[in-house]
């Protein structure tokens, strides 16, 4: 409280009596005012669409050469401030009165703003005003963790370090990924009945307590969800889109086989690098190589060079020479057959996935600008497994007050099985089976699973991990699509898929699942592109 009072006094001083240019401020004060301006824009008090970014005073602000007081006063004169949101008489107030009202608005709002308070706490920690040990004890005081006398005493007497304490709590999932809101902290999974297209499960993590938003909204709880850095209000199964990584190679295999640029027996040599285009892209195994692979083996090995070659051949098919647009047209054609350029038909909010629009060689391995939801990948792998492109539905039936069924719903579908011959489908399916049968995550697993992993890179962040598949391999009953955004490796998504399949077939109990520990909680994790 005293630190907050000091900070608010400092902000008030900057806004009124002793302004200084941004470039002379301490990092702490600069961060505070950066947040304040952002808050004003979010609240639509500072009208960002009205700001003339070519204005000389604005340029001085961007160059940190003027004070917040000078900038905000100038914003008022330029009508960049919506004074209707301030407690002033719009008709008669002069610029001084408007500025005073704006200052009061700022000071009132940051006093109760959680995100602004976090800036204060951050610098208190940096200065050593709050110790790591105190932070750990606060978790008990605030009810984040169940009180434990033994652990509290160990923290207090120094026999348990804050680092070891946190690592153990994370490992035991007493502190959850959602609470940390550090990558990775989100995930999604869709399980579908392969025979009917009925969605068996659709999971978005993190979630929230919907009971607090029904029959009267708990405003405090809703506000906490809105400010939660893990964005629990976003449905990660239907609304989040990322690159698909190598899960897209099943589309490329389909296109290559259907367009006869490869056969099921054709072999392509991987030397670790693809020399037929100017940027010479590498296989993930480089500086190693896969040698000769046919399409099934290329799916098993996730060989980039094989699928670069397929993309290049698709781009040359129409004219005999490379044409970017022609290659993309064919990739889009087969992505469309699998429904990847459409919404899936769900009755809830869903983002539309998007198929690559350029660079067919890179698009063929899931790069370029491919971007898909988890539910779209689910429909895609269901189509691969069944030869049917379903229009998904969440509604199962409607019943009246007496429990009598009024209406039943059933997913309709388009038969796409004639896209490939039975031997071509077999080649894709056997490749998917080999992916899983050679994967350490599935060793000793009694249920035969077929699947495809995908690792999608995102600049400046950990890789996304994806897995699509179906089980049992010989007579599929369910399909599954898993994405762990920024999950480092596709093998982490594959592990999650194995756990879901194991639970579905009652190989694992809920008790077993609840006793599972956090993978990688020892901090020894890194990006992997071996998918």
Over which residues does each language-model region extend?
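Beta-lactam-recognizing serine transpeptidase/beta-lactamase-like catalytic domain environment
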Residues: 2-246, 251-485, 528-531
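Amphipathic oligomerization regions
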Residues: 485-504
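Short, gly/Ser/Thr-rich active-site loops of penicillin-recognizing serine hydrolases
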Residues: 405-407, 411, 498-531
């Amino acid at each position: 409280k005293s630190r907050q009072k000091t900070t608010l006094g400092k902000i008030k001083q900057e806004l009124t009596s002793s302004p200084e240019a941004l470039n002379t401020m301490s990092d702490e004060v600069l961060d505070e005012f950066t947040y304040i301006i952002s808050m004003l824009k979010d609240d639509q008090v500072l009208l960002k669409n009205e700001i003339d970014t070519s204005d000389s005073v604005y340029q001085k602000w961007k160059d940190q050469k003027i004070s917040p007081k000078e900038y905000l006063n100038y914003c008022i004169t330029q009508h960049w401030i919506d004074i209707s949101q301030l407690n002033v008489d719009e008709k008669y107030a002069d610029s001084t009165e408007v500025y005073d009202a704006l200052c009061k608005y700022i000071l009132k709002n940051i006093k109760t703003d959680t995100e602004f308070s976090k800036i204060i706490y951050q610098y208190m920690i940096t200065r050593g005003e709050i110790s790591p040990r105190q932070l750990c004890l606060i978790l008990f005081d605030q009810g984040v963790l169940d009180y434990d006398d033994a652990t509290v005493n160990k923290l207090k007497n120094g026999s348990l370090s804050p680092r070891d304490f946190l690592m153990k709590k994370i490992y035991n999932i007493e502190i959850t990924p959602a609470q940390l809101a550090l990558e990775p902290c989100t995930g999604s999974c869709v399980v579908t009945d392969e025979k009917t297209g009925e969605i068996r499960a659709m999971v978005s993590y993190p979630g929230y307590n919907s009971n607090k938003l029904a029959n009267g909204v708990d405003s405090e709880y809703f506000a906490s969800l809105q400010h939660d850095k893990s964005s629990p209000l976003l449905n990660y199964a239907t609304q989040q889109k990322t690159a698909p990584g190598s899960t897209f190679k099943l589309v490329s295999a389909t296109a290559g086989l259907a367009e006869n640029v490869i056969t099921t027996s054709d072999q392509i040599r991987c030397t670790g690098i693809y020399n037929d285009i100017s940027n010479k892209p590498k296989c993930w195994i480089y500086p190693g190589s896969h040698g000769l692979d046919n399409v099934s083996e290329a799916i098993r090995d996730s060989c980039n060079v094989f699928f670069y070659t397929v993309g290049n051949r698709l781009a040359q098919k129409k004219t005999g020479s490379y044409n970017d647009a022609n290659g993309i047209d064919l990739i889009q054609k087969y992505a469309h057959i699998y429904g990847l350029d459409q919404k899936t038909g769900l009755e809830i909010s869903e983002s539309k996935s998007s198929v690559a629009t350029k660079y067919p060689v890179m698009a063929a391995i899931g790069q370029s600008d491919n971007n898909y939801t988890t539910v779209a990948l689910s429909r895609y792998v269901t189509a691969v497994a069944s030869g049917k492109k379903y229009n998904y539905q969440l509604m199962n039936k409607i019943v009246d007050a007496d429990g009598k069924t009024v209406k039943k719903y059933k997913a309709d579908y388009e038969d796409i099985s004639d896209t490939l011959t039975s031997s071509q489908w077999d080649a894709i399916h056997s490749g998917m089976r080999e992916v899983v049968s050679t994967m350490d995550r599935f060793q000793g697993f009694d249920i035969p699973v077929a699947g495809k992993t995908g690792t999608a890179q995102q600049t400046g962040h950990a890789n996304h991990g994806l897995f699509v598949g179906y089980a049992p391999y010989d007579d599929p009953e369910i399909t599954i699509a898993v994405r762990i955004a920024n999950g480092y490796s596709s093998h982490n998504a594959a592990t999650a898929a194995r756990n879901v399949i194991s639970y579905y077939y009652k190989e694992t109990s809920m008790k077993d699942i609840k006793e599972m520990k956090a993978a990688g909680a020892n901090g020894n994790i890194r990006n992997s592109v071996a998918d």
